[in-house]
């Protein structure tokens, strides 16, 4: 009951416009293209244990944040902040989904079965357990990229004009809309259409403010979430 009351109070503040909004961040955030053909609900993925196929249509009516993750990256500490983001915004209908990938600096080298133990005991360590769903390791760029990532990337402009150092990037062919590094993020709205894309170094606090601002606009338009 207390949790519901807290969520209700926070939502009231959000709708009233009393929560701070994100400031302009150059290309740390890009709005996605209008008139996108199709939705994320046409796709799905296997959970990290490989035992369950999750169709993304189960997230109809939810806000969904897609994040490509890695266990041995300088940004792996974002896992802790992502847990906090999931806990804080879940009452407003947000679900985070994590997709391990080894294409950036070979920083996710282990098997699927090794990823959760690595997070728990190595980095971030200290018994860490993600409170959001992780899926099987796979490619987010290149010839074998997962199809839903093709959809996400084609729906949103890139956050940087540069791809990065080629000897640390492991895919072909390279394209302008490709993900630049681990922990890039895409927000999909309650209708399954991509809304925003964030640079991997954008702070989670700014990501949160951007999401809250979008939720407020949706509420003002009378858009219902699940």
From Swiss-Prot:
Location(s), subcellular: Secreted
InterPro entries referenced in this protein's UniProt entry, alphabetically: Glutathione_peroxidase, GPX_AS, GPX_CS, Thioredoxin-like_sf
Subunit and partners: Homotetramer.
Protein name: Glutathione peroxidase 3
Statement: the UniProt record of this protein carries the keyword Oxidoreductase: yes
Signal sequence bounds: 1-24
Record's catalysed reaction(s): 2 glutathione + H2O2 = glutathione disulfide + 2 H2O; tert-butyl hydroperoxide + 2 glutathione = tert-butanol + glutathione disulfide + H2O
Summary of the function given for this chain in its UniProt record: Protects cells and enzymes from oxidative damage, by catalyzing the reduction of hydrogen peroxide, lipid peroxides and organic hydroperoxide, by glutathione.
Keyword Cell division: no
Source organism (scientific name): Sapajus apella (Brown-capped capuchin)
Name of the gene encoding the protein in the UniProt record: GPX3
Tissue: Secreted in plasma.
Family the UniProt entry places it in: Belongs to the glutathione peroxidase family.
Cited SUPFAM superfamilies: Thioredoxin-like
GO annotations of cellular component type: extracellular space
Any one Gene Ontology molecular-function term assigned to this protein's record: glutathione peroxidase activity
PROSITE patterns reported in the protein's UniProt record: GLUTATHIONE_PEROXID_1, GLUTATHIONE_PEROXID_2, GLUTATHIONE_PEROXID_3
Keywords: Oxidoreductase, Peroxidase, Secreted, Selenocysteine, Signal
């Amino acid at each position: 009951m207390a949790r519901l009351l807290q969520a209700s109070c926070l939502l009231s503040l959000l709708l009233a416009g009393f929560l701070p909004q994100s400031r302009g961040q150059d290309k740390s955030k890009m709005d996605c293209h209008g008139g996108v053909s199709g939705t994320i609900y046409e796709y799905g993925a296997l959970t990290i244990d490989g035992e369950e196929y999750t169709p993304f249509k189960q997230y109809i009516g939810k806000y969904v944040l897609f994040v490509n993750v890695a266990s041995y990256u300088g940004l792996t500490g974002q896992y802790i902040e992502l847990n906090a983001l999931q806990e804080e915004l879940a009452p407003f209908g947000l679900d985070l989904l994590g997709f391990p990938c080894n294409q950036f600096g070979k920083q996710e080298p282990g098997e699927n079965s090794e990823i959760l133990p690595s997070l728990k005991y190595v980095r971030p360590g200290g018994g860490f357990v993600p409170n959001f769903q992780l899926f099987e390791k796979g490619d987010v760029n290149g010839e074998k990229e997962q199809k839903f990532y093709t959809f996400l990337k084609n729906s949103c402009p890139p956050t940087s004009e540069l791809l990065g150092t080629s000897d640390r990037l492991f895919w072909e062919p390279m394209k302008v809309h490709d993900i630049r590094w681990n922990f890039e993020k895409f927000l999909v709205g309650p209708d399954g259409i991509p809304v925003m894309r964030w640079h991997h170094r954008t702070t989670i606090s700014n990501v949160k403010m951007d999401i809250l601002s979008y939720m407020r606009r949706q509420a003002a338009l009378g858009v219902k979430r699940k």
